[in-house]
């Protein structure tokens, strides 16, 4: 999915009317091996981590909160994203590539999961802003019903925003590439990359930064011994998003400039191709980190993992399982790393994972 985000261009040469052919065969070969191994790792860790989040949320007997709804949809977005990686791995190592239908579907699911995950991260930051900074005004609006409605809207937005990324994708000469109409040949790839840079990075980062800055201001204005841990977690959320996605988006922007011949030399094109593959690995692994940032940090979720482990062990050993997991029976807001996020809101707002 490197080059022309995230089309997989397996050509060994890059041609320019005003220059000699630039050999990229060694870069392509390295990228094939490197990305194949990486996709397998991200698929494994992303699948396990996000499935645990889904299991924790769906098996809880505690009433759901609006935060639970968003966390569930974030995990589902990441699962949709990682589910496409085995198909991209097959595409990388196979000479036959993907069939036309699989090419279009895999690209569609990839981008819907990609934008959906980033949009839900943004929605979670807005929800935290409403719960803490505007607690009194937003209490009645932060219901499960509102969460479901907003989540459906986010999925619709993700599909709408993702559609330009896959609407022209098809199998062509054993490659899964964008086959654009002649009038869009030069414009559409630039629009695709710009959409990723703006809607998939710059705007979400701006919203998150504003929301968490105001949250930190509010936390510092209140006396709470858990304040420092809450602030550290907020900084971790923003820093992780910035650290994982910034290098890749810079490379996407430079890839866009390449359409305007900003990088005429072959060495620069080779470096850009290599850097795009490497930064892609960093960016895509963010979906493996989401469960740790938004869920695993919660004391209740760790208790659920312990319960799940004991339950599986009992089943494997043939022992009956006597108790079910009920976070409500182990309720302890102050024991949760994220408790300060909801401590200023109503008691009914607590998430299973927070």
Swiss-Prot record:
Ranges that cross the membrane: 33-60, 71-91, 105-126, 144-168, 197-216, 233-257, 275-298
Disulfide bonds: 103-176
Taxonomic lineage: Eukaryota, Metazoa, Chordata, Craniata, Vertebrata
Tissue: Specifically expressed in subsets of leukocytes: expressed in monocytes, subsets of T-cells and natural killer (NK) cells in the circulation, dendritic cells, as well as in microglia in the central nervous system (CNS). Expression level subdivides blood monocytes into two major functional subsets; CD14(+)CD16(-)-CX3CR1(low) inflammatory monocytes and CD14(low)CD16(+)CX3CR1(high) homeostatic monocytes. Expressed in myeloid-derived mucosal dendritic cells, which populate the entire lamina propria of the small intestine.
Organism expressing this protein natively: Mus musculus (Mouse)
Phenotype for residue 128 to N: Abolished activity without affecting avility to bind CX3CL1
Family annotation (InterPro entries): CCR1-9-like, Chemokine_CX3CR1, GPCR_Rhodpsn, GPCR_Rhodpsn_7TM
Residues on Extracellular side: 1-32, 92-104, 169-196, 258-274
SUPFAM superfamilies: Family A G protein-coupled receptor-like
Modified residues (Phosphothreonine): 345
Gene Ontology cellular component list: cell surface; plasma membrane
Family, as annotated: Belongs to the G-protein coupled receptor 1 family.
Topological domains annotated Cytoplasmic: 61-70, 127-143, 217-232, 299-354
Name this protein carries in UniProt: CX3C chemokine receptor 1
